[in-house]
């Protein structure tokens, strides 16, 4: 028995929904692996607390949307042809994280809660985007992962938009979780003389993880 246009539309929708549901745990597990994004999120949360640091997962979320748009529009393959530009961007990100780590290690105050010149929310958001966008392996992982969850049935454009939006929500949830988890131990570190050293270690860890990519 042949399906009418309405039946085919419903079948296409269900197929796309199944693919999206399958995408969520796979993508979340990839993002949850320790790396430069996670280290930067933890470092910012330890230094500034959960409320201000929510701009970090927001920045990662926007970067995820950019990666998704690049891959699903076909621009990702084109960008990879300019490998030297990606390398330059990556090392700029590494140098900036090293700078943040150096500042944390040399900070005179050991009290995290009273930073004389706290990073602005805009700087936090743009730095998070920079950390994520200068990671070549993030783009490579996106190139390999996203096409697997686009079904043959249904509109490619509609599926791409849905997949990109879901990826952004998952990204915010995963890195928001890192920020929240780090904030839970922040109270114990606020008065510790090692507080800034610990924050600096996370920044340096993020730089090392990005450099190793």
Language-model segments: residues:
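Membrane helix-loop-helix hairpins that form the core translocation module of multi-pass transporters
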Residues: 51-126, 181
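Juxtamembrane transmembrane-helix termini in multi-pass membrane transport proteins
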Residues: 13-87, 144-163, 168
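Short, conserved phosphate/pyrophosphate- and ester-handling motifs at nucleotide-, phospho-/glycolipid
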Residues: 35, 135, 200
